[in-house]
Amino acid sequence: MVFYKYSGSGNDFLIVQSFKKKDFSNLAKQVCHRHEGFGADGLVVVLPSKDYDYEWDFYNSDGSKAGMCGNASRCVGLFAYQHAIAPKEHVFLAGKREISIRIEEPNIIESNLGNYKILDVIPALRCEKFFTNDSVLENIPTFYLIDTGVPHLVGFVKNKEGLNSLNTLELRALRHEFNANINIAFIENKETIFLQTYERGVEDFTLACGTGMAAVFIAARIFYNTPKKAALIPKSNESLELSLKNDGIFYKGAVRYIGMSVLGMRVFENGCF
């Protein structure tokens, strides 16, 4: 079984083709393990589709399934084009969501993440019990719960240095309280936003999270009046361009092909596949 590894903004994924839909949870946990597997933030299983160029099943590194992942959508788009599964412009199915892909340059990929939903506006009082003394989060007056394919909690700090002082235990507590990914961001100017994401399913900070960037972008646009196009810079420091149009959130940036790996017999023997 051959796995192809791609990275989108530091968010890395293993991609494999399958002609049968089955549960890949155990396989995802093993191959995504940083020390005992190939190492990745998630596993993408590319499947045939009657109505689309292809469809996927997406698994986080802990084996949990997710309907959507922004960076993975760009990675799988490039994979599909490079392996003659789909043309430069195509549409695939991610769970119940149609994702359109456009390859602008050899490694610049744009995906349309579709529409978003504001789930809740949460005053800081509802979150205070999770904060430690002198927490950076104490100065965030309001949090925003936004669905961009998966749920994200978004809060904005007043200075960029606050992003380097985030407490993992606080973010983990918020993640379980709201069953969402946690994004803390800083608006440097109207067109540049820095952020860090604590990702559900990875259970740690990740170098980038596409749906998280989309949620931060939407929160900034709606509640802080930023423009319809902005550069978002995650932990990896790779800038991505997000724009809001009538038919959804468009998300553009570089994708890198890292390499290929072949599955060893040990995984088969353990019953993961």
Curated annotation (Swiss-Prot):
Its EC number is 5.1.1.7. The active site is at C69, C209. The record marks H152, E199 as: Could be important to modulate the pK values of the two catalytic cysteine residues. Substrate binds at N11, N60, G70, N71, N181, E199, R200, G210, T211. Pfam families: DAP_epimerase. GO terms for cellular component: cytosol. The keyword Cell wall biogenesis/degradation does not apply. It catalyses: (2S,6S)-2,6-diaminopimelate = meso-2,6-diaminopimelate. It is found in: Cytoplasm. Belongs to the diaminopimelate epimerase family. Homodimer. This is Diaminopimelate epimerase. It comes from Helicobacter pylori (strain HPAG1).
